[in-house]
């Protein structure tokens, strides 16, 4: 039997997983790497840490799977928007990678918005003018690394998101490529025409010579160096992490939606061939591109999901491990109706208020650890409903009635039941929780001829548990109204 290696390069760690051609998980390896915070609001990674952790985990996963030379394909999924610039000749980065969380270009984004450029940028790229995306990070590097822009114009420097940099390293510098989903997160890519946008590149003074070739999500991206795995292996699938999870959840029909719960939360709604422009400040993006055909999505991001549980553990110290929250929530006094708005780093979609800060409402003398745990978990459900309400308002065709979930917090039965209750719709949790790696393994396997196409893959998607709404509609709406008033109060401060 042939096997597929899925490389999952994330924000805090790199993971590698080996799947067989039936997409059964055979092995996992993971390695964390340091986060670099040069100044408040700045976040960087050393690209050598990204590469070394990927190389180490990839080799370890292959060894643990004991697959005896049957590795047939590689897929790559990655943290999106993070920027790497390196020398074409040597492969050496000219600066640390600037991570998607980095806010150093906030003033530049504000100036561009004040100059009236946001409507054009949003119309072309589907994105908001925000430091989150790659374009202004790349401009910052070209502005602040001596001689960088001139070298880029001479073809000496290359830009890439993390997938592109890893492909360059894996292939020994033979391929400078990316996929459409990663390109769509740079704020330089026209998602309607499927090309790098010359006008936006000109506005930011970014030489187009340094941009990678853009491919489908399932394509030949290059062959690895022979010394890495004993022979050259084709890289056949690439997608940004949230788009890979969308594929792993088999959200292939327009109207299907998934929500991934990690440190934050990312919800994607498949809108098919229709590119929907959001009126609620959601993002319009590419869900996946296969056979030259783009499928679009609306995306909403919540900054704080699983991170609110980390706050209970590391900040308030009312739990020792995340698993304790479910028991506390079950023992809480629901009548207290404590509300936590966890705007620790501002409010994400659909509010986009980076200056807002968190608050607790409804405190009484009897509010204790159990009530805080319950309110923290409930905040994730409320924020998810905010996203879904915005998606329904934006797209007349409407979302289907079921939300597919994955990520660490999806393991909590209590959280998923509350989510179903507060959105008033079923929540489906799959058997395979590693949907991001599964998605990119499927893309690579499909391109290799080992795995089925979308329809058959979707038919094989397996449900572990469905959570049906149990809360009375009047209670649901009263609770959600209270949440809305709390959010408005936070934004008013």
Curated annotation (Swiss-Prot):
Enzyme nomenclature, EC number: 2.7.1.30
Keyword Cell inner membrane found: no
Name the UniProt record assigns to this protein: Glycerol kinase
NCBIfam families: glycerol_kin, PRK00047.1
Pfam family, one: FGGY_N
InterPro entries attached to this UniProt entry: ATPase_NBD (IPR043129), Carb_kinase_FGGY (IPR000577), Carb_kinase_FGGY_CS (IPR018483), FGGY_C (IPR018485), FGGY_N (IPR018484), Glycerol_kin (IPR005999)
Regulation: Inhibited by fructose 1,6-bisphosphate (FBP).
Amino-acid positions noted as binding ADP in the UniProt annotation, renumbered to this chain: 11, 15, 263, 306, 408
Organism: Cereibacter sphaeroides (strain KD131 / KCTC 12085)
GO biological process, alphabetically ordered: glycerol catabolic process; glycerol metabolic process; glycerol-3-phosphate metabolic process
Family: Belongs to the FGGY kinase family.
Keywords in alphabetical order: ATP-binding, Glycerol metabolism, Kinase, Nucleotide-binding, Transferase
Residues holding sn-glycerol 3-phosphate: 11, 80-81, 132, 241
Pathways per UniProt: Polyol metabolism; glycerol degradation via glycerol kinase pathway; sn-glycerol 3-phosphate from glycerol: step 1/1
Residues the record lists as binding ATP: 11-13, 263, 306, 310, 408
PROSITE patterns reported in the protein's UniProt record: FGGY_KINASES_1, FGGY_KINASES_2
